[in-house]
């Protein structure tokens, strides 16, 4: 194996390195485009970030504690799939914030997360149970985070509105 192919195989998993974050990015993009969401900007930003930190942190701790070998024998960080955990956490965040606007937003988020999971197994980076655990982890932590946020931050009316019109960014603040 050449050095170039080894470095690409070792440090880049390809498209799923980017796709895992797309559902989370979509939460902020849809909100910025003015699509009606469940929560105001502050609560959305705090809750979405907290769900990512809880999911990514827990996946990292489990990977370094359990030390399950990957199917390709490259390292002992197979369980759970962090890519899948992040993708499903983002998909669940997308569903929580925009699922009532259109069910297709939820379908797109979970479809993308499922693609990431299947791709991780197809690339021989994870066993099926690694991605199943990652999906469950991402879903559960996001549900818990949204439940807790409703207890800590009661819903308020939107005080900041951001939107795009043509080539301008519009910001309105309610005082």
Regions found by a protein language model. Name each.
Residues 1-8:
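Perimembrane loop-to-helix junctions flanking transmembrane segments
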Residues 34-55:
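Interfacial segments of alpha-helical transmembrane regions
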Residues 9-10, 45:
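Short coil/turn segments at secondary-structure junctions
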């Amino acid at each position: 194996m050449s050095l170039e192919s080894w470095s690409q195989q070792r440090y880049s998993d390809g498209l799923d390195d980017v796709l895992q974050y797309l559902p989370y990015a979509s939460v902020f993009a849809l909100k910025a485009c003015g699509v009606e969401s469940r929560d105001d900007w502050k609560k959305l930003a705090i809750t979405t970030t907290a769900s990512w930190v809880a999911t990514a942190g827990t996946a990292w701790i489990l990977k370094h504690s359990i030390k399950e070998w990957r199917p390709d024998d490259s390292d002992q960080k197979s369980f759970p799939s962090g890519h899948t955990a992040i993708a499903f956490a983002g998909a669940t965040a997308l569903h929580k914030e925009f699922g009532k606007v259109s069910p297709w937003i939820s379908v797109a988020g979970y479809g993308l997360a499922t693609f990431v999971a299947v791709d991780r197994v197809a690339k021989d980076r994870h066993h099926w149970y690694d991605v199943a655990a990652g999906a469950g982890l991402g879903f559960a932590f996001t549900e818990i985070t949204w439940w807790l946020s409703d207890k800590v931050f009661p819903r308020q009316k939107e005080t900041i509105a951001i939107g795009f019109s043509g080539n301008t960014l519009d910001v309105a603040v309610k005082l």
